[in-house]
Amino acid sequence: EGGEPCACPHALHRVCGSDGETYSNPCTLNCAKFNGKPELVKVHDGPCEPDEDEDVCQECDGDEYKPVCGSDDITYDNNCRLECASISSSPGVELKHEGPCRT
C-alpha cells in the first residue's frame, strides 16, 4: 500500500487492535492506523486472544433475520452480524440504515 515507514521503539508492550491483530507496542498500532487502517483502535493492553472476535460473533448464532445495511454497503443478517463484522472483517463499519442495502 506504499505507506510511510514508522520509527517505532523496539520496546515490547503488546496491545490488541480492533482488527484482531496483536501489535508489539502502541506505536506500531498507530503506524498501522496511519498506513492503511484508519479505523484501527486499541481494544486493550496485552495480546489479542486467538478467538477474541469469534466469541462476539458466536453470540449472533440463532438471532432473527432482520437485515441491516452497513456503511460498507453490505447487507448483514441483523445488527449483531454487523457488530461482529465491525470488530473482525470490516473494522469501523457502522449501521447505515435498517433493511437491506439498496443497489
UniProtKB/Swiss-Prot annotation:
Pfam family, one: Kazal_1
GO MF annotations in UniProt: serine-type endopeptidase inhibitor activity
Gene Ontology CC entries for this record: extracellular region
Superkingdom classification of source: Eukaryota
Positions of the Kazal-like domain: 1-50, 51-103
UniProt-annotated location(s): Secreted
Keyword rRNA-binding on entry: no
Listed Gene3D superfamilies: 3.30.60.30
Disulfide bonds: 6-31, 8-27, 16-48, 57-84, 60-80, 69-101
Keywords: Disulfide bond, Protease inhibitor, Repeat, Secreted, Serine protease inhibitor
Site (Reactive bond): 10-11
InterPro entries: Kazal_dom, Kazal_dom_sf, Spink4-like
Role, per record: Thrombin-specific inhibitor. Appears to form 1:1 complexes with thrombin. Prevents blood clotting to allow the insect to feed on blood.
PANTHER family per record: SERINE PROTEASE INHIBITOR KAZAL-TYPE 4, SERINE-TYPE ENDOPEPTIDASE INHIBITOR
Name of the protein in question: Thrombin inhibitor rhodniin
Source species: Rhodnius prolixus (Triatomid bug)
